[in-house]
Every structure is written in structure tokens, then in C-alpha cells.
């Protein structure tokens, strides 16, 4: 499941940091970038950035702070190559030549266990353990449900439009989809049949042999609710092991900070500023695109929302985030932003909390005081939980 964008604020990317300057490097022709050479002799660290697409079906913006371009280029190339490598391994819906990935596990459901590498096995084990320790509302066994709802969302094809279609166009599309599938949305019968098989008992993990087996034929893993954050956390730790001075990565709605920001920002301003994107609709026009600005140092931030992948039918919005209990898309919140230290956990929790009702959220947040969260409701209100208020800049 994809996340919505968290916007890196212009103040972070473009305003000088006291002892840094700004450069962009072209990392192996992967993106078009320009280069601005600093003439400040007092510069200690310079800022280098790159942008890539393709991995995890999102735009990934990377910024590193280093003293020389060669070192920065090595880190930026590493980030891009590593994201693409992990994207292929963690992909639940596509095969790649010579790669055993999550899709390989799905292809062999009901037939045989699949031997996977440590990174895939650890991702699946992490996801299942988080389900036991935090919430079952994020469930990587919802692959058949994801596939079912994606079939309808693709038929409506709203993702490819820059603006919402007119009411007449929506009615025409709804009639077209109904003629195609017999219903404007998945039927209760289709959903109930799938829900019957969504249980922890349908998956077998063998830690010794590193095999994964889905017992029912047709069962599918969908690790999209965790994979991007998990991959981001892996890359963050690897960058720190390699000795990166400071780095900030925005992978769609996943923000991770690596290294030590205090080395590259002047005293009194030793944090990054990020903006949480506003949902669509008239209730959010007052926010001018951003519902909140947050300051972070080494935390991970992930947002889940309903306003980038959805379709509308019979006057109701159906987003891409599925409640594993009901089989239907969740609609309690417009977006949920979670801040914790681990990006994989932040990814997991942002999905789980998005699916929870207000009363379930209250119970969860009261039981997990270390989790910071920001909830946006359909009427344009913002709710802060944990110590999130300490991270918000301004009103």
C-alpha cells in the first residue's frame, strides 16, 4: 500500500544552514540535476541531492551533507541502488529475472515452501511480529483483497487524472465498471470469501531453512504497508555504518534521517523541517497544501492517507487502505502521520491507525505513549497524540 507524500519544506532544502552550501549531483544519469558550486571559503559541509523514480512506485528524494562531491555521490548512488534492489525483493505483484521475491512466494501458494534470502524473511517476520505486538489492523495477508480492490480502482482510473472528473463523467464511469464486473464495487460475497482465508494460520515460516509457505492456493502476501518503511530503515542504518555525516530521505510518505544533523546545522536550528501534505477538498483549502510543519532530528515520519489512491462510486470514496476485519477500505480519517524512531514500525503503525476507529485509536495511543501521531479528520480538524505537539512548528 502506498503512502501519501510528506513534503520537504523549501526552508529545509533551499535556505542556507550556516555551515552548508547546496549542490545537486547527477547520479549515473538517473535524474536530471543541476550543479551550484559554492564560493564560500568557510563552508564546512555542502548539501548534495538527487531524485529517483521507479523504486516502490514513488518519488524518492535524497539529500546528503558531506565535505566533497565524490563522497556524496557514493552515498547517493548507494541509496538509489539499494532502494531499487529492495523494491524488487519486496515486490508482491511483479516477477524479476533471477530474483526470488515476495511475488515468488505468492506464485507458489498452496504448492510448496519458497526459500528466500534473509532480507525478505526478516521483513515478513517483522511484519507478523508487529501484528502480534501492536495491532492486527496492518495485515500482510490481505493480498487477495488488495488485488480485488485494485482491479476496481484501476477500472475507474482516477489515479491518472490531474483533476477529479465531473459528476456526469463519474456516473458514466460507474455504469461502465458495473457493466464490466456486474457491480460498481466488490460484492459482499467476493469479500467474504477472501476474508475466510485471512488468518495467521495460513502462513508457515521456517527460520532454520529460511522458507515461507502460504497454505491456501491463491493466497497472496501484500507487504506494501510495511516494505517501504522497512527498506528505508535498512538504508538509514547502512548509511550510518558507512559513516555518512548526515542524510535525509523522503520516499513518498516516508521520511528518515541518518547521521547527525547537529553537525550540519547551526546552533538553534539543528533540526529538519518537514510539511505534512493536506488532503483534498474544500475543508482543507485553508491549509494551503500543508496541514502541519514538523521538526525532526533522527526520527522517522510516515503518513498514510486516502487522497492519492482512491475511486468514488455511489457517492462514496474508496481508498487503497483496506481494513482486514471488514474487507472494505477504511474511512475514519483523511490522513494519519506517525513519528517513531524506526521507519518500518512507523510505516506499519500509520496503516494500522488509519484503519482504526476513533475509540480504537484512543485505546491504542493510551497504551503506547512512545508513539507520536497526527490525525486529520474529514471536516479539516487535526488531532495530536503522544508528544506530537512538541514537534509541531507554529499554530
Pin down the residues of each PLM region.
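Mature catalytic core of soluble alpha/beta enzymes
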Residues: 4-8, 15-395
Amino acid at each position: 500500500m502506498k503512502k501519501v507524500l510528506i513534503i520537504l519544506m523549501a526552508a529545509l532544502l533551499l535556505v542556507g544552514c550556516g555551515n552548508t552550501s547546496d549542490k545537486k549531483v547527477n547520479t549515473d544519469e538517473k535524474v536530471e540535476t543541476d550543479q551550484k558550486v559554492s564560493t564560500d571559503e568557510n563552508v564546512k559541509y555542502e548539501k548534495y541531492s538527487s531524485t529517483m523514480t521507479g523504486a516502490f512506485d514513488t518519488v524518492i528524494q535524497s539529500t546528503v551533507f558531506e565535505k566533497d562531491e565524490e563522497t556524496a555521490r557514493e552515498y547517493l548512488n548507494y541509496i538509489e541502488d539499494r532502494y531499487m534492489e529492495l523494491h524488487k525483493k519486496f515486490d508482491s505483484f511483479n516477477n524479476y529475472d533471477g530474483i526470488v521475491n515476495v511475488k515468488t512466494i505468492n506464485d507458489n501458494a498452496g504448492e510448496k515452501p519458497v526459500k528466500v534470502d534473509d532480507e525478505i524473511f526478516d521483513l515478513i517476520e517483522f511484519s507478523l511480529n508487529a501484528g502480534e505486538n501492536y495491532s492486527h489492523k496492518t495485515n500482510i495477508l490481505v493480498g487477495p483483497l488488495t488485488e480485488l480492490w485494485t482491479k476496481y480502482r484501476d477500472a475507474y482510473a482516477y489515479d491518472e487524472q490531474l483533476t477529479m472528473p465531473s459528476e456526469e463523467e463519474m456516473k458514466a464511469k460507474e455504469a461502465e465498471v458495473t457493466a464490466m464486473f456486474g457491480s460498481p464495487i466488490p460484492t459482499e460475497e467476493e469479500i467474504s470469501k477472501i476474508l475466510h482465508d485471512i488468518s495467521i494460520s495460513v502462513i508457515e515460516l521456517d527460520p532454520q531453512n529460511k522458507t515461507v509457505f502460504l497454505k491456501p492456493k491463491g493466497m497472496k502476501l501484500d507487504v506494501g504497508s510495511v516494505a517501504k518503511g522497512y527498506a528505508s530503515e535498512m538504508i538509514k542504518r547502512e548509511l550510518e555504518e558507512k559513516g555518512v555525516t548526515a542524510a535525509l530521505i523522503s520516499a513518498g510518505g516516508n521520511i528518515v534521517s541518518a547521521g547527525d544533523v547537529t553537525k550540519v546545522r547551526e546552533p538553534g536550528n539543528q533540526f529538519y523541517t518537514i510539511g505534512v501534505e493536506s488532503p483534498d477538498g474544500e475543508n482543507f483549502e485553508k491549509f494551503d497544501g500543508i496541514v502541519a510543519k514538523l521538526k525532526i532530528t533522527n526520527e522517522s515520519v510516515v503518513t498514510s492517507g486516502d487522497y492519492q489512491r482512491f475511486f468514488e462510486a455511489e457517492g462514496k470514496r474508496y481508498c487503497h487502505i483496506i481494513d482486514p476485519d471488514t474487507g472494505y477500505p477504511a474511512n475514519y480519517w483523511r490522513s494519519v502521520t506517525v513519528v517513531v524512531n524506526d521507519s518500518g514500525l512507523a510505516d506499519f503503525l500509520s496503516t494500522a491507525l488509519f484503519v482504526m476507529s476513533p475509540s480504537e485509536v484512543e485505546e491504542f495511543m493510551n497504551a503506547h505513549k512512545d508513539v507520536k501521531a497526527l490525525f486529520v479528520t474529514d471536516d479539516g480538524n487535526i488531532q495530536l497524540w503522544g508528544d506530537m505537539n512538541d514537534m509541531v512548528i507554529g499554530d
